[in-house]
Amino acid sequence: MSTLLYLHGFNSSPRSAKASLLKNWLAEHHPDVEMIIPQLPPYPSDAAELLESIVLEHGGDSLGIVGSSLGGYYATWLSQCFMLPAVVVNPAVRPFELLTDYLGQNENPYTGQQYVLESRHIYDLKVMQIDPLEAPDLIWLLQQTGDEVLDYRQAVAYYASCRQTVIEGGNHAFTGFEDYFNPIVDFLGLHHL
C-alpha cells in the first residue's frame, strides 16, 4: 500500500484548495494511493505527536509527504527524522519567527477552533528545526518567487542542497500546483511500476 501524507499550512484545514486538488487527482489517476490529510492541531508538540503516530501506523507502507507553508516545515522535520521523501511547497523555513505575531488568542477560519498561542509553543516549534538537513536528497522544494507571505529566498538558501524547482512569479497558494502532480508521485516513489 502506498500512502501520501498531506500537511496543510497555518490556520488551514484538510479542505484547503491544494489538498483537494491533489486528492481528486490521485483518486482518478492513482486510486491505489491512500491520501491522508490530518487536521493539524494548532500547537506544535501536539502536531508532532500526531504526525509521529501516523508514520508509525504506516510503518510497512510506502509513505511520502507533501507539505505546504507551515506544513512544509513539519514535512521537513518528519522527513529527516524518519528518512521519508517529502515535497515542500512554498515552505515556512523559520515559522517560529513569523508566529510571534500571532501570540495570544487565535481562531482557525476553516474550523472555527479557538486557541491561545503562547511563547512556549513558539519554542516547541523552534526545537523542531533541523539545520543542516541530514538527508537533503529526500526533499524536493517547489517554490514560487511571488509568494506574498513568505520570503522565498529563505527557502532557496535553506534547501540549497535539495532538488529545487523555483518558479518566477506565482503566489503563496502556488499557482499551477496541479502541473506537478505526476512528478510529485514519482519523487515520492508512490507509483507502481
UniProtKB/Swiss-Prot annotation:
Keywords: Hydrolase, Serine esterase
Family annotation (Gene3D superfamilies): alpha/beta hydrolase
One Gene Ontology CC term in the entry: cytosol
Pfam families given in the database record: UPF0227 (PF05728)
EC number: 3.1.-.-
Enzyme class: hydrolase
SUPFAM superfamilies xref list: alpha/beta-Hydrolases
GO molecular function: carboxylic ester hydrolase activity; hydrolase activity, acting on ester bonds
PANTHER family: ESTERASE YQIA (PTHR35602:SF3), ESTERASE YQIA-RELATED (PTHR35602)
Cited function: Displays esterase activity toward palmitoyl-CoA and pNP-butyrate.
Protein name: Esterase YqiA
Annotated source species: Escherichia coli (strain K12)
